[in-house]
């Protein structure tokens, strides 16, 4: 496409920002995999004192993708991710993309009625949530015919031993125990399924293919599902970096906006992870923790 100053007079004010970009046409996972091959030892994300490299992150995604195939997930299936910003959320999101599924992103503080609506509206056959939100899914599961599997993760599974002890003595002790015979798959058990899966699991998707369902605010009525493509997010990532010429791979983003939010997923997570940035995952915002993380990680964004 030839861009002329007559048709686009604003290009004279762009400075070093290019007038056009050559957009990556693959999937969101492939964008992350591509940057991981370039910077394997760079840190992809930090979470409560633990850091994970791009190399390890891609390995986690692939293991999760194999686990999804092991429980019967097929291309085009919808998987609800009802989680705060934590490692399991990011891993599952890209694993769903890798197997050709569509991630249905839901606010974990949604009411039971809202969760039932999101599950039915999307036709989700699988859901991932935290142990502390298990009761919501248990309450609505019998009303959602499509839902075959509920995977339960726990914040404590991603913590170092000293921090885990503190967590279990404070926040962790408030979480209601899940019955031993509950029809769920624990995150660790789920990953073990992936390690035993030996068949094909990767599905190539193009930019135009659907990848994510986000939900509108519902200010003018019932909330609406918004279907977004791989290209929507890959293009956003490239645009964000192109308009920030001072960005360098390894720069840090304090990812406090949640992944069920368009800005949180598109800018805080995918723009960083598709361009070699480092995400400091924040599961819950408080002014005190936010200030501490800013000082500790010296975040650029």
Each predicted region: which residue ranges?
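A short N-terminal helical cap/helix-turn-helix that marks the beginning
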Residues: 2-5, 21-44, 59
């Amino acid at each position: 496409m030839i861009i002329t100053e007559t048709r686009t007079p604003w290009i004279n004010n762009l400075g070093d920002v290019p007038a056009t970009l050559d957009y990556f046409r693959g999937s969101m996972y492939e964008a992350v995999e591509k940057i991981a091959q370039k910077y394997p030892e760079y840190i992809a994300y930090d979470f409560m004192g633990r850091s994970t490299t791009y190399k390890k992150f891609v390995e986690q995604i692939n293991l999760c993708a194999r686990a999804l195939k092991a429980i019967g997930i097929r291309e085009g299936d919808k998987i609800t991710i009802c989680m705060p910003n934590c490692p399991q959320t990011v891993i599952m999101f890209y694993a769903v993309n890798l197997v050709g599924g569509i991630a249905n992103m839901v606010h974990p503080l949604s009411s039971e009625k809202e969760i039932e609506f999101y599950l039915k509206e999307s036709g989700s056959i699988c859901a991932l949530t935290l142990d502390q939100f298990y009761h919501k899914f248990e309450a609505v599961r019998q009303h959602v015919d499509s839902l075959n599997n509920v995977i339960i993760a726990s914040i404590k599974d991603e913590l170092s031993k000293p921090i885990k002890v503190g967590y279990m003595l404070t926040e962790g002790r408030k979480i209601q125990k899940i019955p031993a015979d509950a029809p769920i798959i624990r995150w660790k058990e789920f990953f073990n399924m992936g390690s035993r899966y030996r068949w094909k699991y990767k599905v190539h998707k193009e930019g135009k293919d659907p990848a994510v369902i986000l939900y509108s605010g519902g200010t003018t009525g019932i909330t609406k599902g918004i279907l977004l493509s791989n290209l929507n997010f890959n293009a956003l990532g490239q645009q964000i970096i192109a308009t920030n010429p001072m960005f360098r791979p390894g720069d840090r983003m304090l990812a406090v906006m949640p992944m069920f939010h368009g800005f949180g997923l598109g800018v805080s997570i995918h723009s960083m992870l598709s361009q070699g940035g480092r995400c400091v995952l924040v599961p819950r915002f408080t002014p005190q923790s936010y200030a501490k993380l800013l000082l500790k990680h010296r975040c650029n964004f």
